[in-house]
């Protein structure tokens, strides 16, 4: 195994690179996980994403070499930033129905010059089916694994509602209760990523089906685990309400929600309703230290203001057969969106719980700023190490150093 960084620039949480799978790209995950991420996020979310890839590998016939790489580094970390393992992703796409190896290469490399995805040769295929035979095996395994996915997702959504605690309720909990809750929420987040991974497999099977109707629908690799259109759709809906009113657009761009409400109470109410639904969502929503729309509703308002001048054109109605296949694709996306949204909902529950714990650490003079709790790992937040301040300082300095650098979008061993 080799380090990606040179000249002593390797981060504490960096992965090592197997020279048989040497190419990694941040292109397909940078929007949702725009690092450098905090240690807490790296600990909780990256382990959750790896739980998802391990579940996905159950439906593949990858062989031992690819299975190990897929489970450990399908999504890797370098300089506190997530990178997709392009070499492994391409091999997976060759097996999974509805996945496109060409799109994986195109979106991941985005014009970057890479000499070879497999400079040591493609991994041996011993014990691994190829081509259509592999895809047939995958479909059979997927249907068996997906049999309970809908019921499990519904139960997961119900748990998110049942286990929600307000800020006031969190304040009333003991330290021990908060510690138990942190463990529970970490497990819930991992459960959500596993469900999202299953629905990504389902999306691929659906994509392979609708391609028969001439619709170009593909899964463009494991980075699609982090793809969500919910914020864009909500923003576009709100932008449509303001599209023809320059005054409202100007107020939105100025983040003046009171001004928008005074000028149009109905639009103000629409924004309030959107924030109540989407308060757990926001820019870089998988990063635990980030603010969400519920913390700062003006972020959603400003996004809608920016979108109001660039509304999409109406789509020409399709024929009945195309509509049927479009509904199939839409239903597959909706299931994955629901699993993803609920994972983000549990992420926000953990975010709020960690904020409360950080405030208590600050009151006890165990840390200097409440937000420093995000520079601990999950286990360290539950059982605070004696050298917590030193760890936090070292990790904060390291993250700030990475923030000042411009890491490459594509990493490969030379």
Residue ranges and their predicted role:
Residues 2-414:
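Contiguous hydrophobic, helix-prone segments at protein termini
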């Amino acid at each position: 195994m080799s380090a990606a960084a040179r000249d002593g620039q390797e981060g504490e949480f960096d992965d090592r690179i197997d020279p048989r799978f040497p190419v990694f790209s941040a292109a397909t995950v940078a929007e949702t996980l725009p690092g450098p991420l905090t240690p807490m996020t790296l600990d909780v979310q990256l382990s959750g994403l790896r739980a998802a890839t391990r579940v996905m590998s159950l439906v593949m016939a990858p062989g031992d070499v690819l299975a190990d790489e897929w489970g450990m580094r399908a999504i890797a970390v370098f300089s506190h930033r997530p990178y997709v393992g392009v070499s492994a992703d391409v091999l997976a796409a060759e097996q999974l129905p509805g996945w496109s190896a060409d799109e994986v290469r195109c979106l991941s490399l985005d014009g970057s010059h890479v000499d070879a995805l497999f400079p040591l040769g493609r991994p041996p295929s011993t014990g691994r089916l190829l081509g259509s035979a592999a895809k047939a095996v995958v479909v059979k395994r997927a249907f068996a694994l997906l049999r309970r996915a809908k019921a499990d997702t519904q139960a997961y959504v119900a748990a998110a509602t049942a286990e929600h605690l307000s800020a006031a309720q969190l304040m009333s909990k003991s330290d021990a209760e908060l510690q138990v809750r942190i463990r529970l929420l970490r497990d819930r987040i991992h459960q959500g990523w596993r469900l999202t991974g299953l629905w990504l497999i389902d999306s691929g099977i659906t994509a392979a089906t609708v391609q028969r109707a001439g619709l170009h629908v593909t899964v463009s690799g494991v980075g699609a685990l982090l793809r969500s259109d919910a914020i864009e759709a909500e923003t576009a809906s709100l932008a449509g309400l303001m599209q023809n009113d320059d005054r409202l657009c100007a107020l939105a761009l100025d983040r003046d929600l009171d001004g928008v409400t005074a000028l149009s109470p109905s639009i103000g109410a629409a924004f309030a309703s959107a924030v109540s639904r989407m308060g757990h969502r926001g820019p870089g929503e998988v990063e635990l230290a980030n603010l969400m729309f519920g913390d700062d509703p003006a972020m959603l308002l400003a996004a809608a203001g920016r979108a109001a001048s660039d509304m999409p054109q109406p789509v020409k109605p399709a024929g009945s057969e195309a509509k049927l296949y479009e509904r199939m694709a839409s239903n597959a996306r909706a299931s994955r969106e629901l699993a993803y949204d609920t994972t983000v909902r549990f992420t926000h529950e953990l975010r709020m719980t960690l904020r409360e714990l950080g405030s208590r650490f600050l009151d006890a003079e165990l840390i200097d700023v409440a937000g420093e709790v995000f520079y601990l790992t999950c286990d360290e937040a539950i059982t605070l190490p004696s050298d917590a301040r030193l760890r936090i300082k070292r990790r904060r300095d390291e993250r700030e150093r990475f923030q000042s650098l411009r890491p490459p979008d594509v990493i490969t061993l030379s």
